[in-house]
């Protein structure tokens, strides 16, 4: 006869085996508007919320559909308006400063870090390094940070 499955023991073993892993739910408390009420509703179920901070959100669509405009323009601007620092990773080398300024994005070093990367491994290493440093900070000293990758498809 097989032993009964013990979820408590399984959970304990699993969370101890992977450094930095946590269990449970992490419901978002902060939201960044997409600049479009209908899209906010589709993403979050609320006309005023939009993209949840602390979660991965992917915008996919045909070339020219407006993904860069929504993400690099509207969402970055809304994040900055909320005091959130933005790391903008540009894999197409297509996001120029004049275009971002036209969208009212603040490109100063205190508000935005724009990185040009063409390899997914570089992006993974950058985010991994950031997360290690971020977790080492005292929780009340951690700034709110938004990562935007334009375009993920070019990295794959």
Q: Where is each model-derived feature located?
A:
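Short acidic-hydrophobic, aromatic-tinged amphipathic segments that line or gate anion-handling sites
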Residues: 110-118
């Amino acid at each position: 006869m097989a032993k009964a499955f013990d979820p408590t023991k399984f959970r304990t073993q699993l969370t101890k085996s992977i450094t930095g892993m946590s269990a449970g739910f992490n419901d978002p408390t902060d939201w960044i508007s997409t600049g479009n009420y209908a899209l906010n509703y589709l993403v979050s179920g609320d006309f005023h919320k939009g993209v949840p901070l602390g979660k991965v959100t992917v915008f996919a669509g045909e070339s020219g559909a407006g993904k860069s405009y929504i993400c690099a323009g509207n969402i970055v601007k809304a994040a900055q308006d909320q005091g959130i620092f933005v790391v903008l990773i540009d894999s197409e080398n297509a996001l120029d400063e004049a275009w971002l300024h036209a969208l009212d994005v603040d490109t100063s070093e205190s508000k935005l870090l724009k990185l040009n990367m063409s390899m997914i491994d570089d992006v993974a290493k950058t985010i991994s390094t950031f997360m290690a440093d971020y977790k080492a900070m005292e929780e009340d000293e951690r700034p709110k940070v938004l990562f935007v990758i334009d375009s993920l498809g070019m990295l794959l």
